Amino acid sequence: IGMSNLGMMILYNMFNEREDVWCERVFSPWMDLDKIMREEHIPLFALESQEPVKEFDFLGITLGYEMCYTNVLQVLDLSHVSLLAKDRKEDDPIVIGGGACAYNPEPIAEFFDMFYIGEGETVYDALFDAYKANKAAGGSRADFLFAASPDSRNYVPSYTCNLQRRRHPVASFT
């Protein structure tokens, strides 16, 4: 089902054309497998190598529609990656959201390190190059995210001014 997503197929092939990138696939398991994985303490792993997702540099999540938001939490939890971006450690994967629902990322912003807004194939080469340069220079994940934040196509919640939300509860119905 997951590979029927044309955007995912394009990115998968594009990333794997680079000699310095190995892109693998991982999918949110159905309830029966989720239960077994939790009972047996099996972390979520990649389809190709069976390596735990937590060992990757990046975890890219395609957000096709709002109903899949809970799957994001399931994937992070099964991967043993902190749900909240602010709680992630230096060796955790950088969690990037993309796809149609990335155009309005605020409802789920606290779970992602960054979002790519727009057509992914236009910027990822620059993003991978920046990550590689940051790593070679001994930079941290925070350094990389900060460097990525000025690009208007990248939304990095931790480096974006948070707006105060005002709540005005309904006083009554007539």
Predicted regions: what they are:
Residues I10-W22:
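Short helix-loop-beta junction
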Residues E24-V26:
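General small-molecule cofactor/ligand-binding pocket signal
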Residues S28-R165:
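Glycine-rich beta-alpha loop elements in corrinoid/cobalamin-binding modules
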Residues M3-L11:
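Conserved alpha-helical elements of sugar-nucleotide-dependent glycosyltransferases
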Residues Q164-R167, T174:
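A conserved amphipathic helix/loop scaffold
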Residues N13, A171-F173:
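ER/secretory pathway lumenal C-terminal domains and tails of membrane proteins involved
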